[in-house]
Amino acid sequence: MRLLVTGGAGFIGTNFVHSAVREHPDDAVTVLDALTYAGRRESLADVEDAIRLVQGDITDAELVSQLVAESDAVVHFAAESHVDNALDNPEPFLHTNVIGTFTILEAVRRHGVRLHHISTDEVYGDLELDDRARFTESTPYNPSSPYSATKAGADMLVRAWVRSYGVRATISNCSNNYGPYQHVEKFIPRQITNVLTGRRPKLYGAGANVRDWIHVDDHNSAVRRILDRGRIGRTYLISSEGERDNLTVLRTLLRLMDRDPDDFDHVTDRVGHDLRYAIDPSTLYDELCWAPKHTDFEEGLRTTIDWYRDNESWWRPLKDATEARYQERGQ
Protein backbone atom coordinates (compact mmCIF):
# COMPACT_ATOMS: atom_id res chain seq x y z
CA MET A 1 0.00 0.00 0.00
CA ARG A 2 1.18 3.53 -0.78
CA LEU A 3 0.62 5.39 2.50
CA LEU A 4 0.75 9.13 3.06
CA VAL A 5 1.17 9.85 6.77
CA THR A 6 0.59 13.47 7.74
CA GLY A 7 2.29 14.52 10.95
CA GLY A 8 4.48 11.46 10.69
CA ALA A 9 7.37 13.11 12.55
CA GLY A 10 5.24 13.87 15.61
CA PHE A 11 4.77 11.59 18.60
CA ILE A 12 1.97 9.26 17.51
CA GLY A 13 2.75 9.59 13.81
CA THR A 14 6.41 8.67 14.33
CA ASN A 15 5.44 5.51 16.16
CA PHE A 16 2.92 4.67 13.41
CA VAL A 17 5.61 5.06 10.75
CA HIS A 18 8.02 2.86 12.72
CA SER A 19 5.36 0.15 13.04
CA ALA A 20 4.44 0.39 9.35
CA VAL A 21 8.06 -0.11 8.31
CA ARG A 22 8.49 -2.95 10.81
CA GLU A 23 5.21 -4.82 10.33
CA HIS A 24 4.24 -3.93 6.74
CA PRO A 25 7.51 -3.86 4.80
CA ASP A 26 5.69 -3.78 1.46
CA ASP A 27 4.11 -0.41 2.30
CA ALA A 28 5.60 2.60 0.53
CA VAL A 29 5.44 5.28 3.23
CA THR A 30 5.58 9.01 2.57
CA VAL A 31 5.61 11.35 5.57
CA LEU A 32 4.37 14.92 5.25
CA ASP A 33 5.36 17.03 8.25
CA ALA A 34 5.99 20.72 8.84
CA LEU A 35 8.82 19.79 11.24
CA THR A 36 7.73 22.33 13.83
CA TYR A 37 8.94 22.11 17.43
CA ALA A 38 6.86 18.95 17.97
CA GLY A 39 7.75 17.17 14.73
CA ARG A 40 11.38 16.18 14.52
CA ARG A 41 13.43 14.65 11.73
CA GLU A 42 15.49 12.86 14.39
CA SER A 43 12.44 10.80 15.37
CA LEU A 44 12.56 9.08 11.98
CA ALA A 45 16.33 8.57 11.82
CA ASP A 46 16.05 4.81 12.33
CA VAL A 47 13.71 4.41 9.33
CA GLU A 48 14.87 7.24 7.07
CA ASP A 49 16.14 4.85 4.40
CA ALA A 50 12.78 3.07 4.25
CA ILE A 51 10.50 6.11 3.86
CA ARG A 52 10.18 9.39 2.00
CA LEU A 53 10.04 12.49 4.21
CA VAL A 54 8.54 15.66 2.75
CA GLN A 55 8.76 18.85 4.78
CA GLY A 56 5.67 20.93 4.17
CA ASP A 57 2.46 22.43 5.52
CA ILE A 58 -0.81 20.49 5.27
CA THR A 59 -2.55 23.73 4.28
CA ASP A 60 -0.41 23.85 1.10
CA ALA A 61 -3.12 22.67 -1.30
CA GLU A 62 -0.82 22.11 -4.28
CA LEU A 63 1.68 20.02 -2.33
CA VAL A 64 -1.03 18.03 -0.54
CA SER A 65 -2.85 17.30 -3.80
CA GLN A 66 0.37 16.07 -5.43
CA LEU A 67 1.18 13.73 -2.53
CA VAL A 68 -2.38 12.43 -2.19
CA ALA A 69 -2.50 11.66 -5.92
CA GLU A 70 0.51 9.37 -5.44
CA SER A 71 -1.12 7.49 -2.53
CA ASP A 72 -3.61 4.69 -1.91
CA ALA A 73 -4.51 5.93 1.58
CA VAL A 74 -3.89 8.89 3.86
CA VAL A 75 -3.50 8.55 7.63
CA HIS A 76 -4.01 12.05 9.00
CA PHE A 77 -2.18 12.61 12.28
CA ALA A 78 -1.01 16.18 11.66
CA ALA A 79 -2.34 18.50 14.36
CA GLU A 80 -1.43 21.04 16.97
CA SER A 81 -2.25 19.18 20.17
CA HIS A 82 -0.92 20.78 23.37
CA VAL A 83 -3.83 22.29 25.32
CA ASP A 84 -1.66 24.78 27.23
CA ASN A 85 -0.32 26.17 23.95
CA ALA A 86 -3.85 26.50 22.60
CA LEU A 87 -4.85 28.52 25.64
CA ASP A 88 -1.92 30.88 25.01
CA ASN A 89 -2.47 31.21 21.25
CA PRO A 90 -5.32 29.36 19.49
CA GLU A 91 -4.57 30.64 15.95
CA PRO A 92 -2.10 27.87 14.94
CA PHE A 93 -4.66 25.30 16.09
CA LEU A 94 -7.32 26.72 13.79
CA HIS A 95 -4.83 26.87 10.92
CA THR A 96 -3.52 23.32 11.22
CA ASN A 97 -6.43 21.39 12.70
CA VAL A 98 -9.30 22.94 10.73
CA ILE A 99 -7.86 24.43 7.53
CA GLY A 100 -5.32 21.62 7.30
CA THR A 101 -8.02 18.95 7.55
CA PHE A 102 -10.12 20.81 4.96
CA THR A 103 -7.11 20.79 2.61
CA ILE A 104 -6.62 17.05 3.10
CA LEU A 105 -10.33 16.40 2.51
CA GLU A 106 -10.37 18.33 -0.74
CA ALA A 107 -7.35 16.39 -1.98
CA VAL A 108 -8.75 12.95 -1.16
CA ARG A 109 -12.09 13.99 -2.70
CA ARG A 110 -10.38 15.08 -5.90
CA HIS A 111 -8.29 11.92 -6.22
CA GLY A 112 -10.64 9.31 -4.71
CA VAL A 113 -8.17 8.26 -2.01
CA ARG A 114 -9.04 6.51 1.27
CA LEU A 115 -8.63 8.63 4.43
CA HIS A 116 -8.36 7.83 8.10
CA HIS A 117 -8.62 10.86 10.38
CA ILE A 118 -7.06 10.76 13.86
CA SER A 119 -8.93 12.61 16.59
CA THR A 120 -9.21 12.79 20.37
CA ASP A 121 -11.65 11.96 23.14
CA GLU A 122 -11.39 15.59 24.24
CA VAL A 123 -14.04 16.53 21.66
CA TYR A 124 -16.63 15.05 24.05
CA GLY A 125 -15.75 17.40 26.91
CA ASP A 126 -15.32 15.79 30.30
CA LEU A 127 -17.11 13.57 32.80
CA GLU A 128 -17.66 13.99 36.51
CA LEU A 129 -15.17 12.16 38.71
CA ASP A 130 -17.93 10.19 40.45
CA ASP A 131 -19.81 9.39 37.22
CA ARG A 132 -19.00 5.92 35.88
CA ALA A 133 -20.31 6.77 32.41
CA ARG A 134 -17.89 6.55 29.49
CA PHE A 135 -17.75 8.20 26.08
CA THR A 136 -19.34 6.26 23.20
CA GLU A 137 -19.73 6.96 19.50
CA SER A 138 -23.11 8.58 20.25
CA THR A 139 -21.87 10.94 22.98
CA PRO A 140 -22.61 14.55 21.93
CA TYR A 141 -19.63 16.76 21.23
CA ASN A 142 -18.93 19.29 23.98
CA PRO A 143 -15.34 20.57 23.54
CA SER A 144 -14.03 22.74 26.35
CA SER A 145 -10.69 24.10 25.06
CA PRO A 146 -9.52 25.79 21.86
CA TYR A 147 -7.63 22.58 21.03
CA SER A 148 -10.61 20.26 21.41
CA ALA A 149 -12.90 22.72 19.62
CA THR A 150 -10.64 22.69 16.55
CA LYS A 151 -10.47 18.89 16.59
CA ALA A 152 -14.26 18.72 16.89
CA GLY A 153 -14.53 21.04 13.91
CA ALA A 154 -12.17 18.82 11.91
CA ASP A 155 -14.22 15.72 12.78
CA MET A 156 -17.39 17.43 11.59
CA LEU A 157 -15.73 18.36 8.31
CA VAL A 158 -14.77 14.73 7.72
CA ARG A 159 -18.33 13.57 8.35
CA ALA A 160 -19.72 16.25 6.04
CA TRP A 161 -17.33 15.29 3.23
CA VAL A 162 -18.28 11.63 3.61
CA ARG A 163 -21.98 12.43 3.35
CA SER A 164 -21.85 15.24 0.79
CA TYR A 165 -19.09 14.04 -1.52
CA GLY A 166 -18.77 10.31 -0.86
CA VAL A 167 -15.24 10.60 0.54
CA ARG A 168 -14.04 7.21 1.80
CA ALA A 169 -13.09 8.18 5.33
CA THR A 170 -13.13 6.85 8.87
CA ILE A 171 -12.48 8.64 12.17
CA SER A 172 -10.96 7.46 15.43
CA ASN A 173 -11.09 9.24 18.77
CA CYS A 174 -8.43 8.03 21.18
CA SER A 175 -7.65 8.48 24.84
CA ASN A 176 -4.36 9.77 26.28
CA ASN A 177 -1.24 8.19 24.77
CA TYR A 178 2.15 7.52 26.32
CA GLY A 179 5.35 5.95 25.01
CA PRO A 180 8.59 6.83 23.19
CA TYR A 181 9.17 10.00 21.16
CA GLN A 182 6.59 12.06 23.09
CA HIS A 183 7.55 15.72 23.52
CA VAL A 184 8.70 16.67 27.01
CA GLU A 185 5.90 19.24 27.33
CA LYS A 186 3.46 16.36 27.89
CA PHE A 187 2.61 15.07 31.37
CA ILE A 188 4.44 11.73 31.53
CA PRO A 189 7.66 12.63 29.67
CA ARG A 190 7.82 15.94 31.52
CA GLN A 191 7.91 14.16 34.86
CA ILE A 192 10.41 11.54 33.67
CA THR A 193 12.80 14.15 32.30
CA ASN A 194 12.36 16.38 35.34
CA VAL A 195 13.67 13.52 37.47
CA LEU A 196 16.47 12.77 35.01
CA THR A 197 17.62 16.41 35.03
CA GLY A 198 17.38 16.88 38.80
CA ARG A 199 14.21 18.96 38.69
CA ARG A 200 11.19 18.34 40.88
CA PRO A 201 8.17 16.81 39.13
CA LYS A 202 5.11 19.07 38.81
CA LEU A 203 1.44 18.22 39.30
CA TYR A 204 -1.45 20.43 38.23
CA GLY A 205 -3.73 21.20 41.17
CA ALA A 206 -4.56 18.26 43.42
CA GLY A 207 -3.97 15.72 40.65
CA ALA A 208 -7.50 14.32 40.87
CA ASN A 209 -8.09 14.60 37.11
CA VAL A 210 -8.56 11.17 35.50
CA ARG A 211 -7.18 10.14 32.12
CA ASP A 212 -7.70 6.93 30.16
CA TRP A 213 -4.12 5.90 29.32
CA ILE A 214 -3.13 3.82 26.28
CA HIS A 215 0.30 2.88 24.99
CA VAL A 216 1.01 4.52 21.64
CA ASP A 217 1.69 1.13 20.00
CA ASP A 218 -1.82 -0.02 20.92
CA HIS A 219 -3.31 3.17 19.51
CA ASN A 220 -1.47 2.64 16.25
CA SER A 221 -2.39 -1.03 15.95
CA ALA A 222 -6.03 0.05 16.27
CA VAL A 223 -5.54 2.73 13.62
CA ARG A 224 -4.12 0.13 11.24
CA ARG A 225 -7.04 -2.21 11.94
CA ILE A 226 -9.51 0.58 11.17
CA LEU A 227 -7.63 1.54 8.01
CA ASP A 228 -7.71 -2.06 6.78
CA ARG A 229 -11.16 -3.17 7.97
CA GLY A 230 -13.16 -0.16 9.17
CA ARG A 231 -16.53 0.73 7.69
CA ILE A 232 -16.52 3.93 5.65
CA GLY A 233 -18.18 6.79 7.50
CA ARG A 234 -17.76 5.08 10.86
CA THR A 235 -16.25 6.57 14.01
CA TYR A 236 -14.30 4.22 16.29
CA LEU A 237 -13.28 4.99 19.87
CA ILE A 238 -9.86 3.64 20.89
CA SER A 239 -8.96 2.82 24.49
CA SER A 240 -7.27 0.16 26.57
CA GLU A 241 -9.58 1.04 29.47
CA GLY A 242 -6.73 2.37 31.59
CA GLU A 243 -8.31 5.04 33.78
CA ARG A 244 -5.96 6.56 36.36
CA ASP A 245 -5.86 9.90 38.13
CA ASN A 246 -2.82 12.08 37.56
CA LEU A 247 -1.64 11.81 41.15
CA THR A 248 -1.58 8.01 40.96
CA VAL A 249 0.30 8.10 37.65
CA LEU A 250 2.91 10.47 39.06
CA ARG A 251 3.41 8.45 42.23
CA THR A 252 3.75 5.24 40.20
CA LEU A 253 6.32 6.89 37.96
CA LEU A 254 8.34 8.14 40.92
CA ARG A 255 8.29 4.73 42.55
CA LEU A 256 9.54 3.11 39.33
CA MET A 257 12.36 5.68 39.24
CA ASP A 258 13.33 4.91 42.86
CA ARG A 259 12.12 8.28 44.11
CA ASP A 260 9.93 9.22 47.07
CA PRO A 261 6.37 9.08 45.65
CA ASP A 262 5.56 12.39 47.35
CA ASP A 263 8.66 14.21 46.06
CA PHE A 264 6.88 16.63 43.72
CA ASP A 265 5.38 20.13 43.64
CA HIS A 266 1.72 21.02 43.25
CA VAL A 267 1.48 23.87 40.73
CA THR A 268 -1.23 26.15 39.36
CA ASP A 269 -3.94 24.13 37.68
CA ARG A 270 -4.75 24.51 33.98
CA VAL A 271 -7.65 26.87 33.25
CA GLY A 272 -10.82 24.85 32.65
CA HIS A 273 -8.95 21.59 33.28
CA ASP A 274 -11.18 18.69 32.18
CA LEU A 275 -12.00 16.39 35.09
CA ARG A 276 -12.24 12.92 33.60
CA TYR A 277 -11.93 11.19 30.23
CA ALA A 278 -13.09 7.61 29.78
CA ILE A 279 -13.81 5.69 26.58
CA ASP A 280 -16.01 2.68 25.91
CA PRO A 281 -14.13 0.89 23.09
CA SER A 282 -16.58 -2.01 22.73
CA THR A 283 -17.48 -1.19 19.10
CA LEU A 284 -13.83 -1.45 18.10
CA TYR A 285 -13.39 -4.64 20.12
CA ASP A 286 -16.54 -6.32 18.81
CA GLU A 287 -16.77 -5.07 15.22
CA LEU A 288 -13.09 -5.19 14.27
CA CYS A 289 -11.90 -7.83 16.77
CA TRP A 290 -9.18 -5.55 18.11
CA ALA A 291 -7.67 -5.71 21.59
CA PRO A 292 -4.76 -3.88 23.23
CA LYS A 293 -1.54 -5.73 24.03
CA HIS A 294 0.04 -3.28 26.49
CA THR A 295 -2.47 -3.75 29.30
CA ASP A 296 0.11 -3.72 32.12
CA PHE A 297 0.41 0.03 32.69
CA GLU A 298 3.36 -0.24 35.06
CA GLU A 299 5.33 -2.30 32.57
CA GLY A 300 4.50 0.15 29.79
CA LEU A 301 5.54 3.04 32.00
CA ARG A 302 8.77 1.25 32.93
CA THR A 303 9.74 0.75 29.28
CA THR A 304 8.88 4.38 28.56
CA ILE A 305 11.13 5.53 31.42
CA ASP A 306 13.91 3.32 30.03
CA TRP A 307 13.47 4.88 26.57
CA TYR A 308 13.94 8.39 27.94
CA ARG A 309 16.95 7.26 29.97
CA ASP A 310 18.51 5.75 26.86
CA ASN A 311 17.68 8.61 24.47
CA GLU A 312 18.75 11.77 26.26
CA SER A 313 20.20 13.16 23.03
CA TRP A 314 16.67 13.17 21.58
CA TRP A 315 14.91 15.09 24.38
CA ARG A 316 17.68 17.12 26.04
CA PRO A 317 17.67 19.91 23.38
CA LEU A 318 13.95 20.46 24.06
CA LYS A 319 13.97 20.46 27.84
CA ASP A 320 15.18 23.88 29.00
CA ALA A 321 12.94 25.87 26.66
CA THR A 322 9.94 23.75 27.63
CA GLU A 323 10.49 24.29 31.34
CA ALA A 324 11.01 28.02 30.76
CA ARG A 325 7.55 28.24 29.18
CA TYR A 326 6.02 26.36 32.11
CA GLN A 327 7.81 28.65 34.56
CA GLU A 328 6.31 31.70 32.86
CA ARG A 329 2.86 30.25 33.55
CA GLY A 330 3.69 29.34 37.13
CA GLN A 331 3.50 25.64 36.32
Swiss-Prot record:
It is an enzyme of class 4 (lyase). The active site is at 121 (proton donor), 122 (proton acceptor), 147 (proton acceptor). InterPro entries: dTDP_Gluc_deHydtase, NAD(P)-bd_dom, NAD(P)-bd_dom_sf. Pathway: Carbohydrate biosynthesis; dTDP-L-rhamnose biosynthesis. GO terms for biological process: dTDP-rhamnose biosynthetic process; polysaccharide biosynthetic process. Binds 1 NAD(+) per subunit. It comes from the Bacteria. Keywords: Lyase, NAD. The keyword NAD applies. GO terms for cellular component: peptidoglycan-based cell wall. Substrate binds at residues 81, 120, 176, 186-191, 202-204, 211, 246, 269-273. Its EC number is 4.2.1.46. Homodimer. Catalyzes the dehydration of dTDP-D-glucose to form dTDP-6-deoxy-D-xylo-4-hexulose via a three-step process involving oxidation, dehydration and reduction. Involved in the biosynthesis of the dTDP-L-rhamnose which is a component of the critical linker, D-N-acetylglucosamine-L-rhamnose disaccharide, which connects the galactan region of arabinogalactan to peptidoglycan via a phosphodiester linkage. Belongs to the NAD(P)-dependent epimerase/dehydratase family. dTDP-glucose dehydratase subfamily. This is dTDP-glucose 4,6-dehydratase. The lineage of its organism: Bacteria, Bacillati, Actinomycetota, Actinomycetes, Mycobacteriales. The gene is rmlB.
